[in-house]
Amino acid sequence: MLSPKRTKFRRHHRGRMKGISSRGNFIAFGKFALQALEPSWITSRQIEAGRRAMTRYARRGGKIWIRIFPDKPVTMRAAETRMGSGKGSPEFWVAVVKPGRILYEMSGVSESIAKSAMRIAAFKMPIKTQFLVKKDKV
């Protein structure tokens, strides 16, 4: 699963996801892509589940790029802990995703295989997504 090797600070504020994604919102590497349509936190486990589903379906053909990285730690307190005594310890990592962000890219396979693979990966995501095809420059 994905997580940063080291970070400047151990704990982050929760923040808020307002607006649309201004970065990572166009196809850069592959020919097909899965794009987010809703804002959400996507955990490293969900990213890995989507990647596994796509690689299993595409088999040897095709290359996959993961365009999001979980760099935000989410902290949790132990159950039945009293208030106070500081913030909880980091439990898992999430990627903050806004609408328009490209989650995965794929190339080297036919459109039908890519669409089916992305559809399986989309079921692993906690948000609505759409399938994109890169337009050829004339």
From Swiss-Prot:
User: GO terms for CC?
Assistant: chloroplast; mitochondrial large ribosomal subunit
Task: Provide the alphabetized UniProt keywords.
Answer: Chloroplast, Plastid, Ribonucleoprotein, Ribosomal protein
Q: What is its main location?
A: plastid
Domain of life of the organism in this record?
Answer: Eukaryota
What Pfam families does the database record attribute to this sequence?
Ribosomal_L16 (PF00252)
Protein location: Plastid, Chloroplast
Gene3D superfamilies under this entry?
Answer: Ribosomal protein L10e/L16 (3.90.1170.10)
GO molecular function annotations of the record: rRNA binding; structural constituent of ribosome
Q: Does the keyword Heme apply?
A: no
Q: Which GO terms describe its biological process?
A: mitochondrial translation
Q: What PANTHER family has UniProt attached to this entry? A: 50S/60S RIBOSOMAL PROTEIN L16, LARGE RIBOSOMAL SUBUNIT PROTEIN UL16M
Q: Subunit composition?
A: Part of the 50S ribosomal subunit.
Q: Which family does it belong to?
A: Belongs to the universal ribosomal protein uL16 family.
- Recorded protein name is Large ribosomal subunit protein uL16c
- Record the organism: Chaetosphaeridium globosum
